[in-house]
Amino acid sequence: MLKWVSQFDEDDRLFVLKQTDLLLKKQYFTKDNFEILLDNAIKDTASKTLHDTSFLDVQLDGKSQSDMLEILNNSCLNTHNFPININNYTKNRFVYQDDVVFTGDRVCRDLEEWIIHSAPHQCSLLIASLYTHTSALYNIEKNLIQTINISGKSISLSLVCFGKIYENKFIMRNQSDVFWPKEENVNIPNNLDPIRFISTAPQGQAPGRTGFAASYVFENGNDRDRFEKILCEKGCYIISLCNNPAASMKPLGYKTYRGLGFGGTIFTYRNCPNNTPLVFWWGNPNMEDWNPLSKWYPLMMRKTY
């Protein structure tokens, strides 16, 4: 922790430590947190319903889904004395379970493929997460309904979140639960192309926050402004270390669209999501000195797949 915070300006270090401590106490989720949510879901579901349901193991990238299925299976064995069904196409009720959903893009990629090529002609599909974001729910529903219509199949779609839904809609940006700086708090250095960081917004509206309203994650407006400013500055510095940074690499976390990044505020025992600000996870102290990854010491080094 001390090595990580020493990379910030001296006047900011104590503030960054305090804000990071507040954030992680609220937003770092352990395996116990996951198990409690999934165990409650299993206990609240009738045995017959579980017998008639198949969970999907169709994630194209990563291991989060298989990890969630392992927890669900253990819970079902302990509660109902039988294992869950996985990829069982004799059923017509399916559940896609994941841990944290940020943009919903991965969910859509996985399920668009499944709907077109593997789903029965008639079935129900429940998309379940432990933590998610309001925009992700909108994106998933919109995109998958379109895919279902294209497929010509009769698939009823529903979404559920067992934990908390975090606010990140544009219209609610002043009280969002993700990092979303005011424009005046953002200073893109001259050595970076500013175009990639300019967010799109409806005509006549500012892309950044225009004020502050308390949210679940952010309770103090001045602290939020200062923390976001610091995270942007250091995130831009990290990007400047790279010779050819990916277009999706943004100071506040990876995002395919233009802007400063997703600004995620959720961290888990499994990994540090790349949708969170770069300062938390980018870098690798095990790399040789010539490698840009050696130039920043991460607080939570990310596991890649």
Residue ranges and their predicted role:
Residues 54-56, 94-95:
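Conserved beta-strand elements of the Class I
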Residues 112-114:
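Glycine-rich, phosphate-binding/catalytic loops in enzymes
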Residues 80-92:
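Short acidic low-complexity segments
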Residues 1-53, 61-62, 116-305:
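PRPP-dependent phosphoribosyltransferase catalytic core
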Residues 58-72:
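Short, charged N-terminal beta->alpha structural module
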Residues 70-80:
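Short helix-loop-beta junction
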Residues 97-106:
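Ser/Thr-glycine-rich phosphate-binding loops at phosphate-binding pockets of nucleotides
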Residues 105-110, 137-141:
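A short secondary-structure junction signal
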